[in-house]
Structures are given as structure tokens and as C-alpha cells.
Amino acid sequence: MGLNKDRGLSSLISDMDTVYSKELGFDKNQSTMIEIDQISPNPFQPRKNFDQEALDELANSIKEFGLIQPIIVFKKNNKFILIAGERRLRAVKALGKKEILAFIADIDENKLRELALIENIQRENLNPIELANSYKDLMQVHKITQENLAELIHKSRTQITNTLRLLNLDIRTQELIASGKISQGHAKVLVGLDQKDEKMLVDSIIGQKLNVRDTEKIVKKIKNNESLPNQEFEDEIKKLKQILNRFGFDCKNKNNDFVIHLENIDKIKKLIKMLEKL
């Protein structure tokens, strides 16, 4: 197959559609077995995180049913560079296989970075931060606007904008989003806060397992300049709760309220004795 070279982003996307068309309904006469040791990963692969559990599931599926879709590579100096299918390649390699079914595409090496970005965007393989960086890279490389990009990859302008805004968050917050410890729903709420409030809220999301709705309520208070318990206050409340729990007291806290359940006279006397010893 000969893909056209030295064209714009729209042509690259068209080329990837051609590759996927070939991949999903490929002619077995045009696919071939390639030694895995001869394949190098795409150096411009935007995807950095690979879920091990998902890879194990894929490996088990390939072991039982075989590799249904070949990977896509291009040839360089008698070796091959991966274009699409890194998860499949990793899974097959984990099974101890020496070869893998591949489709050899005729693609300009200079377009490898863009193809890797587009491949992952179209397959939705990226976490929110990787996706945001991919959008940013494509816009910079091809000098296009958010509106141009939205039209080319068939996404809404709002979706592009909201995703790119994640790159304004603190690096630590971005890492937590990329690792899945903070959801994209949480991330959207955090955008626009100053660094101090962002850090405080991120710590609360992780420490108190706040859902998105709880997070939205806190952000609303911050933006309305309402007082919020600081992290030190929350930490001390948590310690107090742990101490009381150890002595058999049922207690809970919500916002600035701390409630101790004293269901009988014995519990009241026990608490009084504890306080008198202080």
C-alpha cells in the first residue's frame, strides 16, 4: 500500500483511516509475520501509561483466540518501527512469542509523530493529560486553531478547549489525573483555582475520597470567598476521630460540625473521666 507523503494534517487523518480500513478487513496476502525483536516502538508514542491488568486480559484473549488484528509497522534499514498496536505487541511479547502478524505500511518517517498522535486520539487510547498534550502538539506542529483541530478530528470545540485547560493545572495534579487517582470530572472542576486552593482541594479529594459533586460544592464556596476548613484543621479532626473511635465512641464530622454519639449514661461518664485526665 502506498500512502501519500508530505501532506497536511487532514491528509494524515485520511491516511490513518486507510490504514485502519486495511487493518480491520486486511488481505492476509498483504500481512506477514515479523520477528518481535526486529520491531522498535514509536519514539513519539504519546501514550505513557499502560494498564497491566488490561494488558494481561488482552494477552489471555490472544492466547485463546489468536491475534485478530495485525499491528502496523513501517520498514527502516531492514528493521521495523511500530505505528499502531503497541498494546497488542506488548501482550504477544508477554506470551513469549517470537513473531507477530503485522501490516507493513508505506508511510513517511517524518510523519511518524503526527501519525502516533492521531492513532491514539482516534482510538481513544490516551488518558486525559496525554490527550491534552496530543492536542497541543498537533496544533503547534501544524499551526492550527482549536476550531480547526475540532473539525479535523470530529470533536466539539468545547471538548478540545476543556481538555487543553487541564494543562494549566499543577504538575502534581496532572500526574494524579494521568494515573487515574483523580477523575476527569474532578479535573474539570479544579481548573481555574489558584495553586494553593487547588493543592488543598486535591489533598481533600484523595484523603476524603470526595466525589465530583462534593468537589463542585467546595469550589463554589471558594469562588464565593466563603470560609473553608484548612488542611491542618481537617487533619486534626481526623486524629480526634481516630482517638475517640479507639475508646469506643461513635463520632462523625461534616463541614465544621463534629458529633459524638453518646447513646447511654455510661458513655457520658466515660467521656467525662477522659476529659478530666487531660
Swiss-Prot record:
<dbReference type="GO" id="GO:0003677">
    <property type="term" value="F:DNA binding"/>
</dbReference>
<keyword id="KW-0159">Chromosome partition</keyword>
<comment type="similarity">
    <text>Belongs to the ParB family.</text>
</comment>
<dbReference type="InterPro" id="IPR050336">
    <property type="entry name" value="Chromosome_partition/occlusion"/>
</dbReference>
<dbReference type="GO" id="GO:0045881">
    <property type="term" value="P:positive regulation of sporulation resulting in formation of a cellular spore"/>
</dbReference>
<dbReference type="InterPro" id="IPR041468">
    <property type="entry name" value="HTH_ParB/Spo0J"/>
</dbReference>
<dbReference type="Pfam" id="PF02195">
    <property type="entry name" value="ParBc"/>
</dbReference>
<dbReference type="InterPro" id="IPR003115">
    <property type="entry name" value="ParB/Sulfiredoxin_dom"/>
</dbReference>
<dbReference type="InterPro" id="IPR004437">
    <property type="entry name" value="ParB/RepB/Spo0J"/>
</dbReference>
<dbReference type="Pfam" id="PF17762">
    <property type="entry name" value="HTH_ParB"/>
</dbReference>
<protein>
    <recommendedName>
        <fullName>Probable chromosome-partitioning protein ParB</fullName>
    </recommendedName>
</protein>
<comment type="function">
    <text>Involved in chromosome partition. Localize to both poles of the predivisional cell following completion of DNA replication. Binds to the DNA origin of replication.</text>
</comment>
<dbReference type="GO" id="GO:0005694">
    <property type="term" value="C:chromosome"/>
</dbReference>
<dbReference type="GO" id="GO:0007059">
    <property type="term" value="P:chromosome segregation"/>
</dbReference>
<dbReference type="InterPro" id="IPR036086">
    <property type="entry name" value="ParB/Sulfiredoxin_sf"/>
</dbReference>
<keyword id="KW-0238">DNA-binding</keyword>
